Amino acid sequence: MSWFESLILGLVQGLTEFLPVSSSAHLRLTAAFAGWEDPGAAFTAITQIGTEAAVLIYFRKDIARIISAWFRSLVNKEMRHDHDAQMGWLVIVGSIPIGVLGVTLKDQIEGPFRDLRITATMLIVMGVILGIADRLAARDETGGKHRAAKERKKLQDLNIRDGLVFGACQAMALIPGVSRSGATISGGLLIGYTRESAARYSFLLAIPAVLASGVFELKDAAASGHVAWGPTVFATVIAFVSGYAVIAWFMKFISNKSFMPFVWYRIALGIAIIALVATGALSPHAAESAG
């Protein structure tokens, strides 16, 4: 991998990780259109350490409170009813599905799931689901001619069942094209949460899974000796900087804007990929590395 490739791929990772458009799909597509080798699941996992570092810094006050309360709840029974302590447990519970499936489906994630036809299908299907979820949220928030506005759930209302729903949605993002934030936010909206609450828990929920995946891939990459460490680290730093900027923008955006622009973008991109593959302009396995 060249330094230019790492710059572009790092930017793509940072700019798309927190938007409901699938960063893994965009990394895969960028490489395919540029004629580069598929950066692979390992590169994606390692550079995601950079974007999760951005989450740690942006939500540092929330995370510090949650960690402190969670540890205190281990020795103080009264603390177990504290919202921040419960949030710590709910992040752990919500991380179980992706942990189990990530290990079980590792070979599929690094192989068959990276077919561009699957990526395109997931972009469209999950785009439609996000659109439905967004419409339901908007209807509850504004009401209608014959119905009053409905109060939506906030993070204080999160429970184990809902945490597992979020977690199951996050696990779906192991397939390129799904989008971690898109799937979890869609799931949260469908079970009644506000846009901001769904997004906030989505970002917090990703921390354990992404960091664990990144460390796991780092270990394997170091053992294989086939990683261009300089460009990979550079891409991770670029992903961190651009990712932080996107989080700050996105949290403001969702406070009063619809997700529909992302929905139409996903659908249009998915259709374009299918058309390019169908006409032979793009191979479904384009840019895959020999390994």
Swiss-Prot record:
Family (UniProt): Belongs to the UppP family.
Keywords for this protein: Antibiotic resistance, Cell membrane, Cell shape, Cell wall biogenesis/degradation, Hydrolase, Membrane, Peptidoglycan synthesis, Transmembrane, Transmembrane helix
Lineage of the species this protein comes from: Bacteria, Bacillati, Actinomycetota, Actinomycetes, Kitasatosporales
Note: Bacitracin is thought to be involved in the inhibition of peptidoglycan synthesis by sequestering undecaprenyl diphosphate, thereby reducing the pool of lipid carrier available.
UniProt cross-references to Pfam families, sorted A to Z: BacA
Primary localisation category: membrane
BP-aspect Gene Ontology terms: cell wall organization; peptidoglycan biosynthetic process; regulation of cell shape; response to antibiotic
InterPro entries per record: UppP (IPR003824)
Annotated catalysed reactions: di-trans,octa-cis-undecaprenyl diphosphate + H2O = di-trans,octa-cis-undecaprenyl phosphate + phosphate + H(+)
Protein name: Undecaprenyl-diphosphatase 2
